[in-house]
Amino acid sequence: MNEFDLKIRYPHQTGRNDADHLGAFDSETILKRFDAIAWRQQLVRQLQLDGASTSFIVTDERSGQTIRIILDAFAKTQHLEFKLESNIPVLIAKKDVFGLLTRKTKDSISFKHLTQSRAKEYLLAFMNGEIAELEALYRENLSKPMKSAS
């Protein structure tokens, strides 16, 4: 079974490398830890500390790929909203020169305006090695106009 390195950065940890390094766990334990966080309480703390963020950082020790799920303190809705950032590379085709030329640019998979359940789904997909699925969701997300929490 694959193990994942888990770090959690709380709002009071303001240094760039400040985070609680909790160790290596299997995917089931990581999901339990994600569910165990009092996200509403973290949101209140973030707002009290002027937007310092809470991050749930998971690294696949085999591939070195990392995802960071960040609680968005300044969401436009009343619901919890998350962002997902990663170091997982993805090639994106972009049109230039009035749409006549297409070039590929390297980007990293990321998502904004995620609900807690959607963020957990993406976390599970990452831990199950479903990177191609995340890439497809990212590409699909790029082609959609912006909307509120999904």
Model-derived features: positions:
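Short, highly charged C-terminal tails/helix-capping segments
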Residues: 135-150
